[in-house]
Every structure is written in structure tokens, then in C-alpha cells.
UniProtKB/Swiss-Prot annotation:
The keyword Acyltransferase does not apply. Keywords: ATP synthesis, Cell membrane, CF(1), Hydrogen ion transport, Ion transport, Membrane, Transport. It comes from the Bacteria. The gene is atpC. This is ATP synthase epsilon chain. SUPFAM superfamilies: Epsilon subunit of F1F0-ATP synthase C-terminal domain, Epsilon subunit of F1F0-ATP synthase N-terminal domain. It is a peripheral membrane protein. One of its GO terms (cellular component) is plasma membrane.
Length: 140
């Protein structure tokens, strides 16, 4: 393949992902976007969701990455994702994600009972992150 994308995902903890890809699909605040080689330069905010990367080294291999917010910049066939946190499907500890989901559900119930809107928002984000990690882990 003459044209490909270089994809890297970086978090405050360091580099999470670095490969060549034929296409990258991510969810932005405006909806899903697919990035192919020669895409116009763009910077978009990402939501808590999965990023799909179809690699160039296999016609069928897709890498799945749980991304918890951040931004994606596309320029000169380089897709750079700077995320609050991110995990590849193979690195997700499902039991830990399940515990985080249960903890967030408890916190949501407690926040509703106390009518604590700030805690409700925090717990809701934690729940979305846990659900996203669980969803992405099922692709491995």
C-alpha cells in the first residue's frame, strides 16, 4: 500500500499505540468520523468511545482502543490522538472495569439520593468510561 496513515495515541502516562493504518474511525463530539490517507488537516474533540484502526499489515486485522476523551489531529497522513486515558483492547483488565462500573453505579445512586449534581456528573463519566472499556475488551 503506497499510502497509509501513521497512528499514535498518547496519554499523560505515555505512548499507548503506534502503528500504520489504512483507516481510523473515531467518535467526535459531532459524530463518527473516518480518516483515510490524504485526509484534509483537522483537529477534533473526541468523546468517551472506541477508536478502530484497520492496520496495513493485514486485510482483516483491526485494533480497538478505548479512548476516554481528548483530541485527534490529522495532518500529513499522521493521526495523533492525545487522550485523557486510553487502553488497547488486549490491555484492558475486564474484572477491574466491571468493578469500576459497579462502583460508579453505586455512586450515581448515592448522588441522586443526596441530590449532589457534581458527584452525579463525576460518577456518570466514570460509568461511561467503565462501559467503554468493557465494550472494547469484547473485541479481543
Amino acid at each position: 500500500m503506497d499510502q497509509y496513515l501513521t497512528v499514535n495515541v498518547v496519554t499523560p502516562d505515555g505512548l499507548v499505540y503506534d502503528h500504520h493504518a489504512a483507516i481510523v474511525v473515531a467518535r467526535t463530539t459531532a459524530g463518527e468520523i473516518g480518516i483515510l490517507p490524504k485526509h484534509a488537516p483537522i483537529i477534533v474533540p473526541l468523546t468517551i468511545d472506541e477508536v478502530r484502526v484497520k492496520r496495513t499489515d493485514s486485510d482483516t486485522h483491526v485494533d480497538w482502543i478505548a479512548v476516554n476523551g481528548g483530541i485527534m489531529e490529522v495532518r500529513d497522513n499522521v493521526v495523533s490522538i492525545v487522550a485523557d486515558s486510553a487502553e488497547r483492547e488486549r490491555d484492558i483488565d475486564v474484572s477491574r472495569a466491571e468493578r469500576a462500573k459497579q462502583r460508579a453505579e453505586r455512586q450515581i445512586a448515592e448522588a441522586k439520593e443526596k441530590e449532589d449534581t457534581n458527584e452525579l456528573k463525576r460518577a456518570t463519566v466514570a460509568l461511561h468510561r467503565a462501559i467503554n472499556r468493557i465494550k472494547v475488551s469484547k473485541h479481543s
